[in-house]
Amino acid sequence: SSSLTFNAGFTTAYWYRGAFQNDSSISFGADYESGNFYLGTWVADVGESQFDDPSLEIDIYTGFGFDLLGVPSYLGVMGYYYTDNFDRDYEEVAFGMDFGVASFDSVIYGDYKAGSGSASSDYGHFKLNVPLTDSFYGGSLGYSWQTFTGGSIHYATHELDYSTPALGGDIGIVIGHNNDGGAGATKNSDQDTTYATLSIGYTF
């Protein structure tokens, strides 16, 4: 069987892997699934570039789900591309497993497309997800720990996330903290920072 779904959302602040991206962001996406195969794209507003133009993040991803020793797993590739020189492009190979009581997502190989004569930089990422409860004030509560390593950037992030159905969609709250090596949209900003976001998303 196959399916095609679309999604739209808004968040009061856009943080990804413990790094600040934008004060607020509107996003749209589409996902196609057929058996164990998946393919999707996601587009988000990431604010102004160095040339003061509206900039977009455009993600494209594909992969396969499978069982590894009886554990649901996936292997995929993903690219992050930006308009108006907001950032250089990222391309990565990802692998993850879901054990029920915990799951993990990892970037087993990442390539940052540096420009202007600079060498490209390899990077890695690991995220551990632990569901805490699915009955917290009508929603689900979870914890995650993640780390990112690439070039001169090395940092870890802790996050608590809550989600619940509301207003015809899903409301999400994230409270996180990154360590001293955290990086933001501006060099050396948003390090050792506690942050919170409120989001709403719809799937149709």
Regions found by a protein language model. Give the residues of each.
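Outer-membrane beta-barrel proteins
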Residues: 1-204
